[in-house]
Amino acid sequence: MIILGFESSCDETGVAAVCTERGLLAHALHTQIAMHQEYGGVVPELASRDHIRRVVPLTRQVLAEAGLTLADVGAVAYTAGPGLAGALLVGASVAQALAWSRALPAIGIHHLEGHLLSPLLAEPRPEFPFVALLVSGGHTQLMLVDGVGRYELLGETLDDAAGEAFDKSAKLMGLGYPGGPALARLAEQGDASRYDLPRPMLHSGDLDFSFSGLKTAVLTRVKAATRDGGELGEQDRADLAAATQAAIVEVLAAKAIRALKQTGLRRLVVAGGVGANALLRAHLARALKPLRAEAYFPPLSLCTDNGAMIAFAAAERVKAGLADLREGDHAFTVRPRWDLADIQAG
């Protein structure tokens, strides 16, 4: 079965075609970074309008690249939440309209499930069960993944997500949008040892996270440097960026390793936008060697929000018998706030 998937939860419009037997056939993505840069963050109304402009051309592109027509599509999938309500409605509306016009089933997918399963798109493919570290601008969670639809929350952030800590710290340093990648680039030129920043909850013994204290520490350093009309010098900024990144990465890696030890597993999947961070990848590769454990990452192109992970998650649900393939009445809802535990397979 060929599934056409749509992602529109925030500021990326993604469309992809996935075959349940052959895997990913084609995917296309448009990011709105340039549009939101002048505002320093995502403007929900602008995001929704841009999704409307992009989704049909991207759909045509994917079908052409895969050598498909709509007659070849057996089901459609879309991100049903969590995310921005207006943005979610664009992808859901297009998917449901297409499903209605072709008498196809429409499968609503949890955005985080898409991220959790995205490393399975790459080779080598991790076998179940595994521990998943989900790190993005909006979420930081450790999950035990026993199979498709079988997820147990092991720990999560109690305040800011890791990606949010990157972005907010970058903003305090006067870096551009999006802040996380800008901070990571600048950190390459810095000396992390110049600033002693806290590692919140590093030794808490549990698997939860907290990054608000780190953000406050960065603010304190910036205020100290800019007191009495001073400014944060370029090298100081690079050093502070390096120290901030090192603190976040150390906490993420330590908690992930603790999760592996507590579960007795030796497979760690890292997903979400922060999973593209080069220091995190290198740090985990070193830290996992003594455990004889393996880390699995999605391709860099699939770390950000994308349609491939949505279509693929739908395909995995179909193969696991967890998707309702009956043609429905195509009434639908989106869920801007949606707990991953609500989609358990039982």
Swiss-Prot record:
GO terms for cellular component: cytoplasm. Its cofactor is Fe(2+). Keywords: Acyltransferase, Cytoplasm, Iron, Metal-binding, Transferase, tRNA processing. It holds the Pfam family TsaD. GO terms for biological process: tRNA threonylcarbamoyladenosine modification. Its main location: cytoplasm. InterPro entries: ATPase_NBD (IPR043129), Gcp-like_dom (IPR000905), KAE1/TsaD (IPR017861), TsaD (IPR022450). The keyword Endoplasmic reticulum does not apply. GO terms for molecular function: iron ion binding; N(6)-L-threonylcarbamoyladenine synthase activity. Fe cation binds at H111, H115, D305. Its EC number is 2.3.1.234. Binds 1 Fe(2+) ion per subunit. It is found in: Cytoplasm. Required for the formation of a threonylcarbamoyl group on adenosine at position 37 (t(6)A37) in tRNAs that read codons beginning with adenine. Is involved in the transfer of the threonylcarbamoyl moiety of threonylcarbamoyl-AMP (TC-AMP) to the N6 group of A37, together with TsaE and TsaB. TsaD likely plays a direct catalytic role in this reaction. This is tRNA N6-adenosine threonylcarbamoyltransferase. It comes from Bordetella pertussis (strain Tohama I / ATCC BAA-589 / NCTC 13251). The lineage of its organism: Bacteria, Pseudomonadati, Pseudomonadota, Betaproteobacteria, Burkholderiales.
